[in-house]
Each structure stands twice: as structure tokens, then as C-alpha cells.
Amino acid sequence: MKPFIHNDWWPVLEPEFEKPYYQELRRFLVEEYQHYRIDPDMYHIFTAFEWTPFSQVKVVILGQDPYHNPGQAHGCSFSVLPGTEIPPSLVNIYKELQDDLGVQPVQHGYLKHWADQGVLLLNSVLTVRDGIKTANTHRGHGWEQLTDSAIEKLSARPEPVIFILWGSAARSKIKLIDTQTNIVLQSPHPSPLSAYRGFFGSKPFSKTNIALTSLGETPIDWQLPQQVTISDESTSDTH
């Protein structure tokens, strides 16, 4: 099989792409992309893996499924393309980041600076139908098996990983993580529906950097650049 993730994630995940569930998922996606507008476009489904190679992952921020408004999703949890409106959950993430570390909010939602430092921005479901009331339309079709495998492989690495789990869906993944060797930070989701129930004040960013320092790793510079341009994010597809 020709690689369609172009770094060391490929040998980690290639066995999953050979399994029957992924073949079913691929057939489902072919139909969906033919008949509906799907987020993200098929060339950016695996951007999270492209941006943050397996061996360089220090932190995982786990999301659910992509944003489903036009032009926002590009394959990374909570991140949106420059020039699109910052979603409410990310606005709240920026608020907590400012309260936690004094980091100044920016006028974009493009989180590549974090990914470049080893923060894997992973959704548990990698595609969704575009439009109103289309959240979770690709749930239960196989993506969860692939991303669960990615979480398990990271958990089993000799180098510890910090898993940031926001909300009940993300927190349910703790069963995949060896909590004896990795670090898990949990809180309610940053959505406006739940942010005031414990996300605000949870200090995930400072806690992450304290943990990284204790592990002998370089802390994350959470301050995003004020100006960004879109990089060549990914050339992957759904082979």
C-alpha cells in the first residue's frame, strides 16, 4: 500500500488500514464525498498526523469530530483555518489560556504552532457532513477504531505522553491509556454549554508544562503567532 501519511505514523497505523473495518469506512467515505459536502476535504483528513509525527508527540488534545461549518475544519481538533471565525469552544480555550498563563489571545484559530512543538490535535472521528445539525454524522463508521489505535500506540510508547481530555467523550478514552506511565489531565469541555462547570480554572496549559518539565522535556510555548499563513498541511487521501 502506498503511504498516505508521510512520516513515522505510517508504520504505526498501516496495519489498521488493511483491516476490514477500514475498508468499510473507505467505501462509506467514497459515497459520502460523492453525495455530500464533507469536512474536512479529503486531502486534509490526516493533517493532525502529518503535522505531529508519532515520535515527536508530547501532548495529545483530544476532540470529538470536526467543525461542520464551511471552511473551518482542516483535520486538527479545535483548530480552524485562518480567515474563518473562531468557534466558541476555541474562544473559551483562549480565555483559559490567558487566565492560566497570561498568554494573549490572537485573532485566528490556526493552532499549527502547537502541533509543531509536539501537540497532537486529534479528533476521535476525522470527518463529518458539512451543515447545520450534522455533528456526529460520521460517528460509528470506523474512525473511532483507527484513532483508538493511535491513542493506544502512543500510550505504549517508552516516552510518556500527556493526554488532555476535555468533556465526557474524550474522558471515556482514558480506558485506552496506561495511566501508570502517562499523564492524563481531565476537565469538562470548553464548549459554552459546559465551560463554566469546571473547564475555566482547570489550568491545563500550566499543568502540561509543569509535567513536561518534570519529564525533562521542553515546555510548550502556547503563545500563537499574531499573523499566520496556511502551510502545505497535507497531501493525504483515504486510500
Curated annotation (Swiss-Prot):
Cross-referenced InterPro entries: UDG_fam1 (IPR002043), Ura-DNA_Glyclase_AS (IPR018085), Uracil-DNA_glycosylase-like (IPR005122), Uracil-DNA_glycosylase-like_sf (IPR036895)
Disulphides: none
EC number: 3.2.2.27
GO biological process, one term: base-excision repair, AP site formation via deaminated base removal
Name of the protein: Uracil-DNA glycosylase
Active-site residues per Swiss-Prot or TrEMBL entry: D65
Any GO molecular function: uracil DNA N-glycosylase activity
Reaction catalysis annotation: Hydrolyzes single-stranded DNA or mismatched double-stranded DNA and polynucleotides, releasing free uracil
UniProt entry tagged with the keyword 4Fe-4S: no
Gene3D superfamilies: Uracil-DNA glycosylase-like domain
Family: Belongs to the uracil-DNA glycosylase (UDG) superfamily. UNG family.
Record localization: Cytoplasm
Name of one Pfam family that matches: UDG
One Gene Ontology term, aspect cellular component: cytoplasm
Domain of life the protein comes from: Bacteria
Function field: Excises uracil residues from the DNA which can arise as a result of misincorporation of dUMP residues by DNA polymerase or due to deamination of cytosine.
Record keywords, A-Z: Cytoplasm, DNA damage, DNA repair, Hydrolase
